[in-house]
């Protein structure tokens, strides 16, 4: 009798994706991040569901409802902090996952890569609307400042902003629609993640060498299922350390003050995972230019396959490119630091230099270095 795992219409899909899937034998822990992102998404949907049971999306009661969750709901505080810090873990995994793709040349899987970039945008949108929901000072002013950037779009900008706000300022209509978006987007992310996997399984995984691994495959289960479970346990450990020992480490103290349209906080800044893009936005002293730079800083990932001039796929055997890659990582960390600093000397200059370096490395230095490496190898 044939195994039901291989014949049942539903079980067959699961089997081909997670059990009998032929996987390269040499993929490192950098390939764990995909499954960790899946774990993060499930965790966020579950904790978010329980939070939504007690949250009210009304300007008068939103802040109080979050306080009520933390004080009066059974284990509400842990659900709230797991959700808030779970977002941080999500972005840590996301940035490392993208970094892995850049380092090992995974962007040559065009469909998988492009859907990944769309996923990145969707997750960023979800996190942004989610940050507005507690209706603290930074929620309100963050929403005001970031949505206002759309007014830089010529001709339709102002109408577009007022359409998104549902009025002439960030108010009840804005909060209600942001809650609706925050609820629906994770399910769109889940659907996109399935398409992402579908395209990945058309080609099979890349591996650290960047060389086709068809000659040496192993089944996904038990080897990589065990490996993924270990990764998930470590992720949970780090998350719970954060939640139980310093839940407010990555948050902003201003968000413990209820939103007040009459009082602007001295430094308006987004959550830490948006600071690099915020620094690029602020480094250009022109509204439209800043917005274009902000969008380009993420959208530039779409160009990666076009900018790949090396004859090798992975950076594993390319020391000069490796050097550039880690300079890029350091540059992004610098931008993250600058994004959280006030707009004054010397931070403005450092931010501008780091922004120029970011685009210079990706658009010019990496393709040129790859060509030089080709010539050094007489290719």
Curated annotation (Swiss-Prot):
Annotated residues for binding of a ubiquinone: 201
Q: Name one GO cellular component term.
A: respiratory chain complex III
Cofactor stoichiometry and binding remark: Binds 2 heme b groups non-covalently.
Membrane-crossing ranges are: 33-53, 77-98, 113-133, 178-198, 226-246, 288-308, 320-340, 347-367
Record carries keyword Transmembrane helix:
yes
Q: What else is known?
A: Heme 1 (or BL or b562) is low-potential and absorbs at about 562 nm, and heme 2 (or BH or b566) is high-potential and absorbs at about 566 nm.
UniProt keyword annotation of Transmembrane present:
yes
What superkingdom does the record give? Eukaryota
Described function: Component of the ubiquinol-cytochrome c reductase complex (complex III or cytochrome b-c1 complex) that is part of the mitochondrial respiratory chain. The b-c1 complex mediates electron transfer from ubiquinol to cytochrome c. Contributes to the generation of a proton gradient across the mitochondrial membrane that is then used for ATP synthesis.
Membrane topology, as annotated, equals: Multi-pass membrane protein
Complex formation: The cytochrome bc1 complex contains 11 subunits: 3 respiratory subunits (MT-CYB, CYC1 and UQCRFS1), 2 core proteins (UQCRC1 and UQCRC2) and 6 low-molecular weight proteins (UQCRH/QCR6, UQCRB/QCR7, UQCRQ/QCR8, UQCR10/QCR9, UQCR11/QCR10 and a cleavage product of UQCRFS1). This cytochrome bc1 complex then forms a dimer.
Which family does the record assign? Belongs to the cytochrome b family.
Name of this protein: Cytochrome b
Q: Which GO terms describe its biological process?
A: mitochondrial electron transport, ubiquinol to cytochrome c
Q: What does the UniProt keyword field contain?
A: Electron transport, Heme, Iron, Membrane, Metal-binding, Mitochondrion, Mitochondrion inner membrane, Respiratory chain, Transmembrane, Transmembrane helix, Transport, Ubiquinone
Identify the species of origin: Alces alces alces
Give GO MF terms, alphabetically.
Answer: metal ion binding; ubiquinol-cytochrome-c reductase activity
| Cofactors | heme b
Binding positions for heme b b566? 97, 196
């Amino acid at each position: 009798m044939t195994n039901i795992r291989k014949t049942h219409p539903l079980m067959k899909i699961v089997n081909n994706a997670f059990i009998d899937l032929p996987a390269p034998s040499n993929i490192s822990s950098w390939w764990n991040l995909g499954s960790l992102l899946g774990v993060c998404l499930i965790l966020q949907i579950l904790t978010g569901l329980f939070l939504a049971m007690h949250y009210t999306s009304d300007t008068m009661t939103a802040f109080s409802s979050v306080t009520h969750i933390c004080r009066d709901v059974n284990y509400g505080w842990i659900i709230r902090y797991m959700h808030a810090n779970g977002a941080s873990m999500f972005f840590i995994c996301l940035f490392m996952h993208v970094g892995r793709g850049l380092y090992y040349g995974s962007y040559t899987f065009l469909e998988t890569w492009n859907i990944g970039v769309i996923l990145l945008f969707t997750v960023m949108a979800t996190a942004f609307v989610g940050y507005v929901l507690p209706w603290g000072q930074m929620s309100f002013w963050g929403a005001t400042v970031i949505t206002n950037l759309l007014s830089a779009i010529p001709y339709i900008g102002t109408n577009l902003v007022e359409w998104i706000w549902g009025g002439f300022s960030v108010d009840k209509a804005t909060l209600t629609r942001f809650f609706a978006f925050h609820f629906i987007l994770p399910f769109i992310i889940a659907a996109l993640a399935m398409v992402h996997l579908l395209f990945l399984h058309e080609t099979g995984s890349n591996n650290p060498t960047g060389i086709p691994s068809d000659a040496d495959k192993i089944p996904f289960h038990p080897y990589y299922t065990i490996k993924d479970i270990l990764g998930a346990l470590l992720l949970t450990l780090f998350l719970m350390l954060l939640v139980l020992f310093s839940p407010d480490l990555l948050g902003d103290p201003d968000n413990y003050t209820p939103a007040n349209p009459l009082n602007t906080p001295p430094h308006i800044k987004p959550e830490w995972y948006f600071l690099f893009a915020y620094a690029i936005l602020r480094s250009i002293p022109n509204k439209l230019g800043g917005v274009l730079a902000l969008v380009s800083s993420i959208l530039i990932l779409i160009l990666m396959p076009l900018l790949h001039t090396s004859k090798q796929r992975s950076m594993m055997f390319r020391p000069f490119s490796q050097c550039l890659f880690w300079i890029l990582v350091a540059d992004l960390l610098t931008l993250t630091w600058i994004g959280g600093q006030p707009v004054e000397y010397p931070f403005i200059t450092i931010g501008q230099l780091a922004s120029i370096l970011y685009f210079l490395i990706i658009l010019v230095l990496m393709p040129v270095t790859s060509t030089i490496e080709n010539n050094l190898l007489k290719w």
